[in-house]
Amino acid sequence: MKPTILLYDSGMGGLTIYDAIRENLPDAHYLYCFDNAYFPYSEKSEAVLIELAVGIVQKIAENYPLDMVVVACNTASTVVLPALRERFAMPIVGTVPAIKPAAQISQTKTIGLLATKGTVTRPYVDELIERYAKDCVVERIGSTDLVEIVEEKQQTGSVDMRRLQKVVEEWQSHPTLDTVILGCTHFPLVKEELQQLLPRVSFFVDPGNGIANRVVSLLQDVKRNVNNENKENQAFCTQNSENFLKREKVMQNWGFKRLNILNFVEK
């Protein structure tokens, strides 16, 4: 039987995680929800992020028996995982910055963490750096603008390079930075553009493959809820908007039949 896997993010950046999982589990039944009503998550309070996460998973679980939930958002994952695991029985997989592998591959022991403002300031990230990158210098850039740049690229196919350059300009002349962690699920979608702007950087690291391996491992022990052999992949957003049709086209290009509006209201 096909497992049903829900992925959610504030936007469409979590599709990079979906893509990595789908490569390993091409026949699974996928649900993807982006919370555009509260996009971006980067500067939302922890209480709001938890409330949104629980509400979204609860609403979708009412209509779809879920075998797994993947929080395809670094910002949310640094906050909401304990609350989701306490509330729901299915496995919950989070997305956190790939600090451990970055520290292992950096030759100069100088790493850049490129993430949202919310992620770079979380104590959880400090703990990861202390645990896995104690011998490294970790520079941080927190950017909400970069998330919006990626969302625009997904809908238009183009990137404003001058706007992108402003995000990373402080790293362009850095003498020893050789590894950059793409600490937001949106950011792998502009990896090529970042490589152009940061030619001295040898490694760009994102957690997609690691998360996919974790999902595959956990599903081996999961008892499947129902037979989903003929179920179509479905996408959800939490608010209608003027660019709804563009977003629906993006989701269809990623293999989702249609984009539905989830009637979700923050409690």
From Swiss-Prot:
Keyword Transit peptide applies: no
EC numbers, comma separated: 5.1.1.3
Pfam assignment, any one: Asp_Glu_race
Active site: 73, 184
Gene Ontology biological process terms, A to Z: cell wall organization; peptidoglycan biosynthetic process; regulation of cell shape
EC primary class: isomerase
Metabolic or biological pathway: Cell wall biogenesis; peptidoglycan biosynthesis
Catalytic reaction(s) noted: L-glutamate = D-glutamate
InterPro entries associated with the record: Asp/Glu/hydantoin_racemase, Asp/Glu_race, Asp/Glu_racemase_AS_1, Asp/Glu_racemase_AS_2, Glu_race
GO molecular function, one term: glutamate racemase activity
Keywords, ordered alphabetically: Cell shape, Cell wall biogenesis/degradation, Isomerase, Peptidoglycan synthesis
Positions contributing to substrate binding: 9-10, 41-42, 74-75, 185-186
Function: Provides the (R)-glutamate required for cell wall biosynthesis.
PANTHER family for this protein: GLUTAMATE RACEMASE
NCBIfam families named among the record's database cross-references: glut_race (TIGR00067)
Family: Belongs to the aspartate/glutamate racemases family.
Protein name as catalogued: Glutamate racemase
Lineage: Bacteria, Pseudomonadati, Pseudomonadota, Gammaproteobacteria, Pasteurellales
